[in-house]
């Protein structure tokens, strides 16, 4: 799927930076088996992310880490993001954590609100099947169709839209203005999650070498929040299911910019190791009747 979706889009300027950064011939060729793990080195940012995982997930994921170690990988604990106490919310995913700390110029939400206002206007300008052309139009439509679109928060509106359209209203308030606070927040979030964040943790290999990846628990939402702020890739491997809820969870690898091929290599090697071992913590196959069957449309005449 990655091979099918990557590549620059001339209509989407954000994609142009990948030119020259992707592997020639695609990502499939980077797939590896468990033997590739020998002499690989991974870091565990325990205080940055792992402490927020529940004990059951910690136990399962650490069993997989032990498998990796047995396969020849080196595991280094304590490879922390230097600014994790500042940028990682202890209470779960929170993209306005900077404002909660009293610093809107250190909040991801500060620039997300502005970017959304401008980008949704650009997107709507190309649609031909609607008269809605701006965030103002969307907000007005939601108010006019409160029962189905959730314009008002509960109890003024419907409980299905408990907070109404608070995100839209917050974005609307910015009017898309990229002011000094916008640029301060953007610079802070990118710097503290990139060179002073993930990149710094990846540099904590033995003898001043770099790590092949950071191992993180992706059910801890702060992991992908930090990666998203940095614009860095994360890949998740199936790991297990919660005993009480039956909900699945995974083990994730985090890397720096343009390191998708590295993540594909190590994720495929770990998954091969899971299947080659006796561990129950791996991708589970469907067991329902007929899951291998394919529905084929049949045209009946007359």
Regions found by a protein language model. Name each.
Residues 55-57, 88-111, 224-225, 229:
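Short glycine/threonine-rich loop-to-helix capping motif typified by GTGT followed
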Residues 13-24, 83-105, 206-207, 289-300:
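Surface-exposed intrinsically disordered loops and tails
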Residues 29-49, 96-196, 238, 244-251:
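Short helix-loop capping/hinge segments that flank enzyme active sites or metal/cofactor-binding pockets
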Residues 1-26, 51-86, 105-147:
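Acidic-enriched catalytic cores of C-N bond-cleaving enzymes acting on peptides and small amides
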Residues 5, 62, 163-302:
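Glycine-rich, small-residue loops and helix-cap segments
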Residues 1-59, 276-301:
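A short helix-breaking turn/cap at a secondary-structure junction
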Residues 48-52, 81-86, 102, 109, ...:
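Solvent-exposed loop/turn segments at secondary-structure junctions
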